[in-house]
Amino acid sequence: MIEFSCNRTSEDMTPVIRDIEIAKFAQTVLYDYRPELLTYTSYGDDPYYEPALLDPYDFAQNYLGSNIEVHDIYTETKGELIAGAAVFNYQKVKVFDKDNMCTREILVPPNTILLDNETVDHWHKGFEFFTIMHECGHLMLHQRVYRRELVQGFYTTGNVPDSSENAVLCKRSNIGGTRRTGLSTNEDFREHQANTFAGCMLMPPRVFIPYVQKQMRKYDRFEDELMVTRTINDGSGEYWRYVDVVNRTARHFGVSYKAVRVQLAKYGLQADPKDERVKEAKRRLKLYQSLWK
């Protein structure tokens, strides 16, 4: 297994790292795990891209060696629904016992991914897969923040299995790969980093970019292989072309519509021609293409 390392960290060991560096790390991990996830077929002058798809359960269990458990994760904070959790050390987690209609604590072992029943049973499959990879991101990127050594029955920082320092409980509102704006705390940055890792694992730029460009070339009104951004149904042809490409891509990669839109922006594949950020989008596209060119 490829181990993550980072030369720059904050005081609490949160990595200080750019998104492109996380993308490079994710690409290295994919090469080590299943290199075919970074390949596509090509036929003559009209390439036909069919990237292989990552199985988050297989990656978490067989590559990271993590356990995956599903519970009704309980939180006392009103309106704060938990999608999943990454457990680094032995941790007591409060769950809801539907059989007895009460809450109880369970002791969760290290290197465990918890999924809430709502995440698995009622949400889009893409959200479930993204949540698993988000938690894998925490387990791979943030060991130095949370991991404690157990020596003769005691952690090096104290025997505290009920401490919140042993696990990351991730709110549903934080899952999905939001763009890098409004980040102020180290926790914010760690959530962003986990989202970035998940997005780059499920939609690797090496295959995602050519696949999307193939879909875009079906419409001759996209300029310079940049999609016209249309987030509101204004009845224009650009809006429906945008929706079609995003939906096709989401279905193929097994992710949500929202997750695709985030990666399109991150990789520089979408911009509004009336916006000055077109140049920035083109710079991003070249940057992520440099991962394999």
State the predicted function of each range.
Residues 1-293:
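Active-site hotspot residues in diverse enzymes, especially metal/ion-binding acidic/histidine motifs
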